[in-house]
Structures are given as structure tokens and as C-alpha cells.
Regions:
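N-terminal Rossmann-like FAD-binding beta1-loop-alpha1 element of flavoenzymes
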Residues: 7-33
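Conserved N-terminal/central alpha/beta ligand/cofactor-binding core
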Residues: 36-102
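A short, basic/flexible loop-to-alpha-helix module at the beginning of a structural domain
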Residues: 1-6
Length: 102
């Protein structure tokens, strides 16, 4: 009888979201990241270096929310859009603190 490895957390997806989650979980947990291809092969690279984030005073959360909802053609969940964009600066700052170069 074969045995399977045991993990506390299984993360499905190895793009920026999945790998960010893995980095933020406590080191005491046994974590597995499941990817359909090599690690880092998620859709994040499709952004080609671009990222929608409110980083300057001349920009606004409301402008990004409006743009995202318009581009989403009715498919976006507005509370999720507002939550994500409202925290975009924090997310970029965290990525930079982890060594991400933009």
C-alpha cells in the first residue's frame, strides 16, 4: 500500500496569488503548491509588467473601480473589485518588500 504525503494547506495555483499566500502562511505549516505547469506559470505574466494599482495622489480608487467594472462588461463583482483596488497600494508595497522588482 502506498502512502501519500500529508499537508496542512494545499494551494491550487502557482501564480502571484498562490505564491503570495504561500509566503504569508506560518512556517510551522506543511504547505503544498499545486500547479498545472512549472511554478510561477500562472496568468500573472500575461499582465506584461502592468498592474492596476492606486500609487499616486493624482490617481484614485474610484477611477480604477470604474475602469475595472467597465472593462469587466458586467462580469465583475463590485465589492470584490473595491476590496482589491482599495488595498492595491498595500499589495504593491508588500511585493516590493519581498524583493519584487517593477
Amino acid at each position: 500500500m502506498s502512502t501519500f504525503p500529508s499537508f496542512d494547506v494545499l494551494i491550487i495555483g502557482s501564480g502571484a496569488a498562490g505564491l503570495s499566500l504561500a509566503l504569508q502562511l506560518p512556517n510551522t505549516l506543511q504547505i503544498a503548491v499545486l500547479s498545472k505547469s512549472q511554478l510561477g506559470s500562472g496568468s500573472t505574466s500575461w499582465a506584461q509588467g502592468g498592474m492596476a494599482a492606486v500609487l499616486h495622489d493624482r490617481d484614485s480608487v474610484e477611477a480604477h473601480v470604474t475602469d475595472t467594472l467597465n472593462a469587466g462588461a458586467g462580469l465583475c463583482h463590485e465589492p470584490a473589485v473595491r476590496f482589491t483596488i482599495g488595498r492595491s497600494r498595500q499589495s504593491v508595497d508588500w511585493l516590493v518588500s519581498q524583493g519584487m522588482a517593477f
